[in-house]
Amino acid sequence: MSELDQLRQEAEQLKNQIRDARKACADATLSQITNNIDPVGRIQMRTRRTLRGHLAKIYAMHWGTDSRLLVSASQDGKLIIWDSYTTNKVHAIPLRSSWVMTCAYAPSGNYVACGGLDNICSIYNLKTREGNVRVSRELAGHTGYLSCCRFLDDNQIVTSSGDTTCALWDIETGQQTTTFTGHTGDVMSLSLAPDTRLFVSGACDASAKLWDVREGMCRQTFTGHESDINAICFFPNGNAFATGSDDATCRLFDLRADQELMTYSHDNIICGITSVSFSKSGRLLLAGYDDFNCNVWDALKADRAGVLAGHDNRVSCLGVTDDGMAVATGSWDSFLKIWN
């Protein structure tokens, strides 16, 4: 028996040991524990606003921390900052590359970022002295498309890429300060923990990984999905996260239990998930699907509690405001809708 086979065998044994240890910890299921909790009942949300202005598919959106302004990115080559109260466009930013896949609003409200098939994360300053919006930095370093980006603060941003890595950037210097390697497929999405010390990433290797922002190391790896993970979102308390995948399921993983707690699926749902987001309390999980709908799940009981139907094409992105008062969905039909 060759050395390689021996190592393979050892690796399998270790994997089995880990699986057994996890099983030993799992003394009850989430379903059993939440059995005596009342269901949330039917959740009915109405479209309060429709944001019209993009001329092509919308690929990404992100709320500002004020829960009023949001940024959206479209195949029409524009980044639009919207006032969701009035539906006015605050800024319309022409992009150098129209192949944009992600956008992000800085917590301060001073900057937005975007990127896509140009492999570059472009940072735009919204608060210049002249009043015009301009590129303040172009972060080049990834060797694959930019799939997701999120600001830690005005000078730090985390990106995920089709080159299988994530990166932490110093915006001032334009340099990658940390590279997060470990995925074996395109990284599709990332989500920062509430304290911004950790983040999770979901990738086309069907795994999710938990990373330490400062140390640059992978803390935990979560498996269970049977296809690409397209979307990922932290639970509001930072102890768990949800994923959405092409296998037509969303799943809830717990950091402390080190395993999957719940699967959100239905026999009628056979299409992939593009985006996931929790309500402010974490009781509801909202997920956007390829079949033009957005399903609202009871996160504790895994029952479907409602549907947001109104788009005429794939729901590509969604987000819940920081104050928990509204949901925005963006679609390939070129419209954004605000619901509550």
Curated annotation (Swiss-Prot):
Phenotype when changing H91R: In MRD42; uncertain significance; no effect on protein abundance; no effect on complex formation with gamma subunit; no effect on trimer formation with apha and gamma subunits; no effect on receptor-driven G protein activation
GO BP of this protein: adenylate cyclase-activating dopamine receptor signaling pathway; cell population proliferation; cellular response to catecholamine stimulus; cellular response to prostaglandin E stimulus; G protein-coupled acetylcholine receptor signaling pathway; G protein-coupled receptor signaling pathway; phospholipase C-activating G protein-coupled receptor signaling pathway; Ras protein signal transduction
Gene Ontology CC: cytoplasm; cytosol; extracellular exosome; extracellular vesicle; heterotrimeric G-protein complex; lysosomal membrane; membrane; photoreceptor disc membrane
Coiled coil: none
Impact noted for substituting D118G: In MRD42; decreases receptor-driven G protein activation; no effect on protein abundance; no effect on complex formation with gamma subunit; no effect on trimer formation with alpha and gamma subunits
SUPFAM superfamilies found in the cross-reference section: WD40 repeat-like
Keywords of the record: Acetylation, Disease variant, Host-virus interaction, Intellectual disability, Phosphoprotein, Repeat, Transducer, WD repeat
In-chain residues carrying the UniProt-annotated modification N-acetylserine: S2
Subunit comment: G proteins are composed of 3 units, alpha, beta and gamma. The heterodimer formed by GNB1 and GNG2 interacts with ARHGEF5. The heterodimer formed by GNB1 and GNG2 interacts with GRK2. Forms a complex with GNAO1 and GNG3. Interacts with ARHGEF18 and RASD2. Forms complexes with TAS2R14 and G-proteins; these complexes play a role in the perception of bitterness. Component of the TAS2R14-GNAI1 complex, consisting of TAS2R14, GNAI1, GNB1 and GNG2. Component of the TAS2R14-GNAT3 complex, consisting of TAS2R14, GNAT3, GNB1 and GNG2.
Name assigned to this protein: Guanine nucleotide-binding protein G(I)/G(S)/G(T) subunit beta-1
